[in-house]
Structure formats: C-alpha cells, structure tokens
C-alpha cells in the first residue's frame, strides 16, 4: 500500500482503492465498493472552503439507465432511491474526516433534517453532491457535522442538514 497523498480531487479508480481499504490504511475509513459506492469522482475537496469555512466536498455520480437500482426500484417506474443519495452524503463526510488524517472506521450517526423535492430518473445524466462541513471535532471523538445538497443535471432535488459521521477505532459497541 502506498502512502496516502492528500489531493484536491479523486477519480473513480482511486475511490475504489479507498473502498478496498488501500487508501487510509488498515482499520481506517473506507468507502463502499460498487454497487454501494454512490459516486464516480470527487471533483473538489478542501479543508477551508464551503459555506461555513470548515471544509467542502463536491462529488459526482454519472447516471446511466443500466444502474442496478433502476431495475428493482420500481419495475415500470424506475427512480434512484433517495436513501442512496443520502448515503452518498454520509460516505463523503466520512471520506473527508479520513482525508484530513483522522484514524478510525466511519459510521453514519444521523441527520437533523432531510427533504426530498425531486427525483433521479434513468434519463438523467449526472448527480452532483455538495457537502459543506459545519463542524469537525478531532479529539478523542472524531466527528463531522455537515449540510449536504443533491442536484440532478443542475437542479437541486434534496438536502440534508446536520449530517453526522464519526470515525471509531473500536466498533465493538455498535
């Protein structure tokens, strides 16, 4: 395994490497691998940017009609499950915490508010996730709190406030 190189963007192959546990080291945060990896690239990640100046992530998922979830959700009425977009936002907050150099396995801890106002259909081209970190705790507890937005082909279709993800060096109590 190569030493982790903190960059400002990542391509799909690098995200899959992260999912295989080969980016941040053994026992540390991983992204899911396909099919649960809900992003194709991180186009921008920053420790200081974003709406609150605490960090920002912009990531994308390319939509094609043959994505696995369109066949089963729902037959004859295909739509990407909203929970997959929500999970993508949690995935990105966990990635951010590890990208900053924090140890531990990522676990979603909740969200304050989630609102859906649109849908992702197989005719869409691209989903964009925009995460704005509000607070990053890096003590005995490592946790990120963020607001996130999901857009399809440039139109915002849902948001989540106060997404919470923690990194844990011991997950036995879960």
From Swiss-Prot:
Cellular compartments annotated: Cytoplasm
Keyword Cytoplasm belongs to the record: yes
Enzyme Commission number, as recorded: 4.2.1.59, 5.3.3.14
Gene3D superfamilies named in the record: Hotdog Thioesterase (3.10.129.10)
Pfam families in the record: FabA (PF07977)
Transmembrane segment boundaries: none
A GO BP entry: unsaturated fatty acid biosynthetic process
GO CC, alphabetical: cytoplasm
Keywords from the named record: Cytoplasm, Fatty acid biosynthesis, Fatty acid metabolism, Isomerase, Lipid biosynthesis, Lipid metabolism, Lyase
Reactions catalysed, as given in the entry: a (3R)-hydroxyacyl-[ACP] = a (2E)-enoyl-[ACP] + H2O; (3R)-hydroxydecanoyl-[ACP] = (2E)-decenoyl-[ACP] + H2O; (2E)-decenoyl-[ACP] = (3Z)-decenoyl-[ACP]
InterPro entries noted in UniProt: FabA, FabA_FabZ, HotDog_dom_sf
Active site: 73
Annotated pathway: Lipid metabolism; fatty acid biosynthesis
Quaternary state and interactors: Homodimer.
Protein name, as recorded: 3-hydroxydecanoyl-[acyl-carrier-protein] dehydratase
Gene assigned in the entry: fabA
């Amino acid at each position: 395994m190569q030493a982790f190189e903190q960059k400002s963007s990542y391509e799909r192959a690098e995200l899959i490497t992260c999912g295989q546990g080969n980016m941040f080291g053994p026992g540390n945060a991983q992204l899911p691998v396909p099919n649960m990896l809900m992003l194709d690239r991180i186009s921008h990640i920053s420790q200081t940017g974003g709406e609150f100046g605490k960090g920002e992530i912009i990531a994308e998922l390319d939509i094609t009609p043959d994505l696995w979830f369109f066949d089963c959700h729902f037959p004859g009425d295909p739509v990407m499950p909203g929970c997959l977009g929500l999970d993508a936002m949690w995935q990105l907050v966990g990635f951010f915490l590890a990208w900053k150099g924090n140890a531990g396995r990522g676990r979603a801890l909740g969200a304050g508010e989630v609102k859906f106002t649109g849908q992702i259909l197989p005719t869409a081209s691209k989903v964009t996730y925009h995460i704005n970190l509000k607070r990053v705790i890096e003590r005995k507890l490592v946790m990120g709190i963020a607001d996130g937005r999901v857009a399809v082909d440039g139109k915002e279709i849902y948001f989540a406030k106060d997404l919470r993800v923690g990194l844990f060096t011991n997950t036995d109590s879960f």
